[in-house]
């Protein structure tokens, strides 16, 4: 059975800018299939990527984020793998609110 991959990183960059940059980095190697923001503190991403591109994706993200260490796979497999990435924004205040409009009726 193929194991999922769990990564975590953090950044001091502006949250909005960082999310856009991280999305561009991921889109070069794989696809974001789900995401969950946690106020302005962090965001969790579910990424699908070919196993042969995982090391490249990690290197690109590690060039942008402070990432935990990862043992390289050195794989040439085209099998799809799932990566769970949690990004913490170091300058967050925890006060982000998402306004939900009232629906009449």
Residue ranges and their predicted role:
Residues 2-105:
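Long, contiguous binding/interaction regions
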């Amino acid at each position: 059975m193929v194991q999922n991959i769990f990564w975590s990183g953090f950044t001091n960059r502006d949250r909005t800018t960082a999310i856009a940059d991280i999305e561009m980095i991921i889109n070069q190697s794989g696809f974001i299939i789900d995401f969950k923001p946690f106020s302005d503190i962090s965001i969790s991403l579910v990424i699908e990527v070919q196993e042969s591109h995982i090391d490249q994706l990690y290197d690109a993200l590690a060039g942008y984020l402070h990432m935990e260490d990862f043992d390289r796979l050195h794989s040439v497999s085209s099998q799809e793998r799932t990566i769970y990435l949690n990004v913490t924004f170091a300058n967050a205040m925890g006060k982000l609110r998402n306004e939900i409009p009232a629906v009449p009726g």
